Amino acid sequence: MSELRDTRLEKCQALSDLGQGPYALNFEPTHRMAALHEAHADLPNGEEREVTVSVAGRVMTRRVMGKLAFFTLADETGTIQLFLEKAGLEAQQEGWFKQITGLVDGGDWLGVSGTLRRTDRGELSVKVSDWRMLTKALQPLPDKWHGLADVEKRYRQRYLDLIVSPDSRETFRRRARLVSGIRRWLDQRDFLEIETPVLQSEPGGADARPFETHHNALDLPLTLRIATELHLKRLVVGGFERVYELGRIFRNEGVSTRHNPEFTSVEIYQAYSDYIGMMELTEQMVSAVCQEVCGSCQITYQDTEIDLSPPWRRATMHELVEEATGLDFNSFSSREAAAVAMTGKGLHAPELADSVGRLLNEAFEQAVETTLIQPTFVTDYPVEISPLARPHRSKPGLVERFELFIVGREHANAFSELTDPVDQRQRLEAQQARKAAGDLEAQGLDEDFVTALEVGMPPTGGLGIGIDRLVMLLTDSPSIRDVIAFPLLRPEPRAADAPAMG
């Protein structure tokens, strides 16, 4: 690799000696590749068109065959073949054919001008009459036929992955279309996007361990936000009846195929609605965006057909757990009785799950969650695990909350929001006690948020959707790292830190 790099550095010097230089300031293409193909789709095989075009891109392949050479030039939209003929180039400037075939390597950025021809086999080509080195690459490209075999290298050097993998490029195009589609859908329905703080003195809105930092000038301990919920609710109190934010969230948690410590979510709040209204909003928005991004609500994920056409299945947590395990958690009068029954069914009853409600959630996660393949709204959660949700209108001990599961993964979480400041204070104080007892994911007591509720928040439905998991679903990606351009990875050991060999 070092020898190859040295050779390319020598070519940089040769380009400079020729007065061209290896790093151009600019170039003005007349067309991008896709537009060029579209504009001249009517050119018959074997014919030329005396129109001069200019294109720019990266050299992906090159073949030199005596007095002829063929390069493949790629830009973001597609590729074009370059046809280089010694006689034609030498007529423009002596030595050009030797220079371009000798000094241009795969991976270089090149700008060319010329006329168009279509080969007898139907390939549109630019017959090059002028060329310019735009950027000389010092490193070679991966094998275009095999790409990057090392999965971790694809994540560490995403730029290489994007160069050689059309599938990876399409994943991030779909991600961009999904994000813009969600914003457009909400904006068209009078939702207003307002940015809330990333740096916070009291993290809240989720059960998660935050990243901690420090503001030097104010000598103030701060955390990165773990949710946007509490600030968006303050905006509802302030009179914004339809508000949302699509942005980055940070949670100091483990890394897996479903979790990245830095991820993207959209949180949506609608005054005068409830969790039933948010179910309708969720299935309407997700199905509409899926139709826009994928062209259909019927998709395939890891060889399984998924139908995102509404309406989606709705079932309570109690119903699903009883269906899967035979356990009726409404019949248990104590935590101990529930734990014994769970153990009898081969389920684990952890000590931290200190109530019947928490054990119900454990049973759901162990026995039900991964079986929910088609879109399913799981409703009516225990109050113990839902400190920000409104008490259920008819079921004591439960709250009006749902989570959306698809392909065995949670994709959304929503409430009829708790608007009673007295009840909210009591629940957050209970969370505070768990936090003081060592629960690093328990929420603290945000006094200003409780004060905001005392000013008065109207009945409100709230919803959060994980963007990364939704992108995974719509791009058939098995890992969250496949849909985050630059996922968090452990740094590679430096050469000096590597263990000695031998």
UniProtKB/Swiss-Prot annotation:
EC number per UniProt: 6.1.1.6
Enzyme class: ligase
UniProt keyword list: Aminoacyl-tRNA synthetase, ATP-binding, Cytoplasm, Ligase, Magnesium, Metal-binding, Nucleotide-binding, Protein biosynthesis
Keyword Metal-binding applies: yes
Residues noted as binding Mg(2+) 1 in the record, renumbered to the chain: E403, E410
One Gene Ontology cellular component annotation held by this UniProt entry: cytosol
Matching InterPro entries: Aa-tRNA-synt_II (IPR004364), aa-tRNA-synth_II (IPR006195), aa-tRNA-synth_II/BPL/LPL (IPR045864), Lys-tRNA-ligase_II (IPR002313), Lys-tRNA-ligase_II_N (IPR044136), Lys-tRNA-synth_II_C (IPR018149), NA-bd_OB-fold (IPR012340), NA-bd_OB_tRNA (IPR004365)
SUPFAM superfamilies the UniProt entry points to: Class II aaRS and biotin synthetases, Nucleic acid-binding proteins
Catalytic activity: tRNA(Lys) + L-lysine + ATP = L-lysyl-tRNA(Lys) + AMP + diphosphate
Residues holding Mg(2+) 2: E410
SUBUNIT field: Homodimer.
Name of the protein this chain belongs to: Lysine--tRNA ligase
Gene encoding the protein: lysS
